[in-house]
């Protein structure tokens, strides 16, 4: 998947641009038939551009359907929609496990057996910048694992 499941976001963006394109063409046709002056048309186009720009924080994405991967600043809790991705290549990370009274259950895969809380589970944080995904694992050495998000590799330091 390359850092998470982005298809719903991509589809939402394509629909967003399709709706605005239809609205824009509809406005041009409306302006043509109403014989609106160019000055009025330019003001309304500027207003439409401002509205599109203001709607971007609501979409939580930059204004480009070509940029599919959002940067993820360093965090100890990956987004829920990306948890399976991060836990596949860093399966010993603490954010993949839910521990209660010393017994831990995997958050992603229900068929994983319960384990006792021990050194198998490491404190991890993650980050993603462009197509570079990183794990920061404590107290393992080496404690940083770099990989291409589109061609991920498992962290070798987890093999006991």
Swiss-Prot record:
- For this UniProt entry, which segments traverse the membrane? 13-33, 35-55
Describe the task this protein carries out.
Plays a role in virus cell tropism, and may be required for efficient virus replication in macrophages.
The way it spans or sits in the membrane comes to:
Multi-pass membrane protein
Name this polypeptide is given:
Protein MGF 110-13L
- Keyword annotations from UniProtKB, A to Z: Host membrane, Membrane, Transmembrane, Transmembrane helix
Per UniProt, subcellular location reads as: Host membrane
Membrane found in the keyword field: yes
Q: Which Pfam families match?
A: v110
Task: Tell me the protein family, please.
Answer: Belongs to the asfivirus MGF 110 family.
Q: Which organism is it from?
A: African swine fever virus (isolate Warthog/Namibia/Wart80/1980)
Q: Which GO terms describe its cellular component?
A: host cell membrane; membrane
């Amino acid at each position: 998947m390359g850092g998470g499941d982005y298809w719903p976001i991509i589809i939402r963006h394509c629909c967003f641009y399709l709706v605005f394109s239809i609205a824009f063409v509809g406005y041009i046709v409306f302006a043509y038939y109403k014989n609106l002056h160019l000055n009025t048309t330019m003001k309304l186009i500027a207003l439409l551009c401002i509205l599109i720009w203001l709607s971007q924080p609501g979409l939580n994405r930059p204004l480009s359907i070509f940029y599919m991967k959002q940067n993820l600043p360093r965090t100890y809790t990956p987004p829920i929609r990306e948890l399976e991705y991060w836990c596949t290549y860093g399966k010993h990370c603490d954010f993949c496990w839910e521990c209660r009274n010393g017994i831990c259950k995997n958050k992603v895969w229900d068929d994983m057996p319960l384990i006792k809380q021990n050194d198998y589970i490491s404190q991890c944080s993650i980050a993603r910048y462009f197509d570079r995904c990183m794990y920061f694992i404590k107290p393992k050495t080496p404690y940083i694992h770099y990989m291409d998000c589109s061609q991920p590799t498992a962290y070798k330091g987890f093999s006991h």
